[in-house]
Regions:
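Short acidic, glycine/serine/threonine-rich loops at helix termini
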Residues: 11-16, 60-61, 121
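A C-terminal functional module that forms or caps the active site or interfaces directly
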Residues: 46-111
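Short, ordered loop/turn segments at secondary-structure junctions
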Residues: 4-9, 52-54, 114
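Short coil/turn connectors at secondary-structure junctions
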Residues: 8-9, 43-46
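Anionic-ligand binding region
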Residues: 13-40
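N-terminal loops that bind phosphate or other acidic moieties
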Residues: 24, 55, 126
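Solvent-exposed alpha-helices and their adjacent loops that cap or buttress functional pockets
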Residues: 38-43, 101
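Terminal amphipathic helices with adjacent charged low-complexity linkers/tails
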Residues: 64, 123-128
Length: 128
């Protein structure tokens, strides 16, 4: 597990979990080089890159933890399971946080797309 700019595994809505990652890389160039070397060595499998949510969209840990716990409890009470669980939880957490979790989720997606694109550009330079 690679942490992009972090030595901690970032949870979904916040930046810190207290759990370490195996490696910390700080630039798209470093990510591309790691993938390139792995490919050159013929190693199978992927690389899991964890990318923290931007600081401006990171939620207060106590607030989001409380919302998640309440949403999980409600899902149990409402008999939600299987593939219906994720959409139920996301909607419930959004309601419980007044929409803040949705804003955070959207920014997390944008941030991941930016990093993926930047790393892909750097990888293309290495594989010419």
């Amino acid at each position: 597990v690679i942490g992009y700019g972090t030595s901690e595994l970032p949870p979904f809505y916040t930046r810190k979990s207290g759990f370490g990652v195996d490696y910390e890389l700080d630039t798209p160039e470093q990510l591309a080089k790691a993938f390139h070397v792995k490919r050159e060595l013929g190693l199978r499998g992927g690389l899991l890159v964890t990318n923290p949510i931007p600081e401006a969209y990171s939620m207060d840990k106590e607030v989001i933890d409380k919302a998640i716990a309440e949403a999980v409890e409600d899902a149990k009470k409402d008999g939600i399971h299987g593939k219906a669980t994720t959409p139920y939880l996301l909607a419930k957490i959004k309601d419980l946080t007044g929409g803040d979790s949705l804003d955070s989720n959207i920014q997390l997606v944008f941030n991941n797309a930016r990093l993926g694109a930047a790393a892909a550009v750097e990888l293309s330079k290495l594989e010419k």
